Amino acid sequence: MRTFKLIAAALWVATFGAGAAYALDAAPRPQPLTPALAPVLAPATKYGSVRDALRSGMRDYNAGDKIGAVHALEYAAGEGHSLALWKLGRMYADGDGVQHDDLKAFEYFSRLADQHADESPDSPTAAVVSSAFVALGSYFLDGIKDTYVGANPERAVEMFSYAASYFSDSNAQYNLARLYLEGTGVRKDARHAARWFNLAAEKGHTASQALLGHLLMTGQGVPRQRSKGLMWLTLAREASTDGPKDQWIVTLYDQAFAAADESDRKLALALLEQYIQARR
């Protein structure tokens, strides 16, 4: 596996240039998000410990008592528990048992990011912390209508960059790549986009595999590698569903397959077999 990683790294530099290392540099810790916000108010119900409150909240949630879950989770969130902050943020973002409220979701995610940004990437709660940064990036990208959270693409880049580099979050890497590809909040740079897509694609991120494959097939700002592009698109196509959500992946694959000649297809198949074998 180590040999494969070294080969992959060499191919990456050969494809995107030695400047690829820049994309791996850790982003600085973001400045505090919620300096003026009031602390979460603990509900009237008291619990023996934060852990008891969290367990009660998750038990109520799984039993379908979402209101009871919110009360218990608010207690744990008031003590800064990362999972409670994340769960409340997700519930308000999705309207899951509570009235949909993006501002409340933003504030819970902000507290989580502020209080746990230095969490070890190897910790059990790292995934929820990085997920909060990704959610914040999405909120900053478009803003929240009729609230103090305005559109701030540069701040979105900061959120995605931190989660992408410090936590190696594939969703953050994908979103950051999209911003580089579009030139939103950052200077447009297809090579940087390809590097971040590549990092996420290697983790099995389907949309990143599709867009990386498309970039390599078309040579859009990066050296054209049709066979490798078709390989990534094939992986994305195999992982996609036949529903409308993934239709764009199917379309990109069909276009790439039609544009490829027989030698491209054979080499793509060989690369695909190598890729799969290396991960067994």
Predicted regions and their residues:
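N-terminal leader/linker segments that initiate helical-solenoid repeat arrays
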Residues: 12, 20-67, 71, 85
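Hydrophobic face of amphipathic alpha-helices that form TPR/SEL1-like repeat modules
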Residues: 53-60, 87-94, 133-145, 173-182, ...
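Short coil/turn and helix-start
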Residues: 62-63, 78, 96-100, 122-126, ...
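TPR/TPR-like (Sel1-like) alpha-helical repeat modules
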Residues: 103-115, 223-244, 270-276
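Flexible helix-coil transition and linker loops at the boundaries of alpha-helical arrays
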Residues: 41-43, 77, 111-130, 162-167, ...
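Structural signature of tandem alpha-helical TPR/SEL1-like repeats
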Residues: 64-68, 99-108, 148-159, 187-196, ...
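Terminal, low-structured helical/coil segments at or just beyond the last alpha-helical repeat
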Residues: 31, 244-280
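Helix-start (N-cap) detector for alpha-helical repeat units in TPR-like alpha-solenoids
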Residues: 50, 82-84, 120, 130-131, ...
